[in-house]
């Protein structure tokens, strides 16, 4: 059995590819879940998750973002798809492609229309085409820069062993180059023009209630996320931050007037995607002007 998984900016969805070296050897069921605030149903042969989050003020009032996700299975070499109440089963398949689309109503009010359209467009392509488009979209950014600091004999070591060896002997220059490219990978994977800039916890946060609400800390963290943008030839990935900053102006003007009776605009140490510009959290540091 082989499994490949990637998320694609080219098609704006996740792709799971399952194969077996024996005909009709794939037999499985799949579902979706999260820790809270969700409902999963089978909708035809799709699996549909829907929910609405708390508003962040009153956890009993479910008036926050709405979200939805669909999973559609495609069997290029045949097999059977059987929907259940909250799972979908596949029998006697040799290859399966699971397409996972998702959206919130932050950008798209027609959630189901959005995620259904993504699946319809991606479903017209075979797996090779989906993967090719994904790799091309990534490499169009990643391949712009190479960094050669020299080589060492440790380059073939597993990363945990390589890091342990580095603690004992720092003569591993290509590890620094790899770490440089890792930073570029994180920014490339986090945003595109027209989307939001990467936040404090990033896309890979593993908790529902993220530390510091996954906000934008303006003292240094937001800047650190964008350090690779200009110097590492990823300038367009700086644009989401520029647009986000523009969105703070109207709110920041009200904050400047209310708190300081000042002209212009101001924000403080905490920001978010809803134009929060007032002092926040603790008075010892929450009033830091930015």
Describe the function of each predicted region.
Residues 288-290:
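Active-site neighborhood of glycoside hydrolase catalytic domains
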Residues 1-281:
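Aromatic-residue-lined binding/catalytic grooves and analogous aromatic/hydrophobic interfacial grooves
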